[in-house]
Amino acid sequence: MRFLTGNVVVRARGADFFVAIDARSAGGADAWLALTNGAPLLRRFTLSPSAPTNLYDFTRAELRLWLSRRELNPVHAARIWSYLYLDLVEGFGAMTELPARVRARLEAEMCVGNLKIARETDSRDGFTRKYLLELADGAAIETVLMRFAGRATACVSSQVGCAMGCVFCATGQMGYTRHLTAGEIVAQAVHVARALRTAAFEKCHVMRDPSPGREAGEKSRDEADRHRAPPTPRLRNLVLMGMGEPLHNYEAVMRAVDILRDDGGLALGAERITLSTVGVVPGILRLAAEKRPVHLAVSLHAADQEERAALVPVAKKWPLDELMAACRTYSETTGRRVFYEWTLIEGRNDTAAHARAVGRLLRGLPAQVNLIPLNPTAGYDGTPGRTEAARRFQEILSREFALPSTVRQRRGIDIAAGCGQLAVAEQS
């Protein structure tokens, strides 16, 4: 079967369908790239007509409504919620206090998450664990867990791949497949919280909790702390800095944030969730207008439009002046500072002149700069900025511009869990 919708061709074969641009239509491949923010020309998807609904997609109010519409007492929503986010159950069999009728209906229509652990890898120093998670449709994502003294941070993905194409980012190099649902985002956080209740990390070293805006596998040099962890550390922080661009998947990401902040569940406070964007201006402005309770981190990497566009292609769509205007609006509207991320690449953006350019760009803004030495990826031939260059950069920001900054120590690099390293080799 084949049909057209605009310039897009959809071909179906059994449970599979393929989407591509009609080569005969105006624009051809260029039109496809414009429509999909650079996704490959042909994509294959598999339909799963009988797939159950992911219970993690529901807010508590929606769960009450779901019960009511099935003539079940909505009071059970509170117990279901506590099973999911306090007891961290993996299936309906553990929900023993629910009436049999309620549990049977849940089992018939729902699933408790839809992620499978395909692989888990620990860093040599014991600070970091990376999970390769398989989704219901066969796609895969990566999630990272970091341990600190008495608490932990989860770095979660928001998309399968990424359409933004940052040249030094492994996720950008793999291309974009699809958005994650809110439930798939929430399930990553629940998985990390559940893992923390096991004995798997008893011998791991831990770090002090980082300030907002730091990615998985990273911490500042002055925060190393090798005390042993308590037996049941709590998931305290969540960073949307894994695979994907969160503001490209705004609705699902914000729904996930609302679910994760619910006081009756994981209860992650506003000061404990950080969202990192490459600079999707409409999303930043929407965050500001809605005054969403999250920290905002912006991947800056260059203070010159031409230089930034070479590293971050989306800067061609949302130029630096538009991005900075949006960040100013965000801070003025919300009263929050913005964390500006700067990947230090030797000879590219790590000189004293670059530091002063950043200082001038951010002058007068409530800001903090997070300096991140480049992490290796297969698709980018660059060298991390040297320690002395990072210190000089930081000193200039502090001395000449009174601009706070951190220099991150690289963590989880041996398992490709650092900033910019998350990727899945093959996607169906």
Curated annotation (Swiss-Prot):
Belongs to the radical SAM superfamily. RlmN family. It comes from Opitutus terrae (strain DSM 11246 / JCM 15787 / PB90-1). One of its GO terms (molecular function) is rRNA (adenine(2503)-C2-)-methyltransferase activity. The gene is rlmN2. Its EC number is 2.1.1.192. It is an enzyme of class 2 (transferase). It is found in: Cytoplasm. Keywords: 4Fe-4S, Cytoplasm, Disulfide bond, Iron, Iron-sulfur, Metal-binding, Methyltransferase, rRNA processing, S-adenosyl-L-methionine, Transferase, tRNA processing. GO terms for biological process: rRNA base methylation; tRNA methylation. SUPFAM superfamilies: Radical SAM enzymes. [4Fe-4S] cluster binds at C162, C166, C169. The active site is at E142, C419. Specifically methylates position 2 of adenine 2503 in 23S rRNA and position 2 of adenine 37 in tRNAs. Residues 207-232 are annotated as: Disordered. Its cofactor is [4Fe-4S] cluster. Binds 1 [4Fe-4S] cluster. The cluster is coordinated with 3 cysteines and an exchangeable S-adenosyl-L-methionine. The keyword Cytoplasm applies. The keyword Nucleus does not apply. It comes from the Bacteria. InterPro entries: Aldolase_TIM (IPR013785), Methyltransferase_A (IPR040072), RlmN_N (IPR048641), RNA_MTrfase_RlmN (IPR027492), rRNA_lsu_MTrfase_RlmN/Cfr (IPR004383), rSAM (IPR007197). GO terms for cellular component: cytoplasm. Residues 148-414 form the Radical SAM core domain. This is Probable dual-specificity RNA methyltransferase RlmN 2. Its main location: cytoplasm. Disulfide bonds join C155-C419.
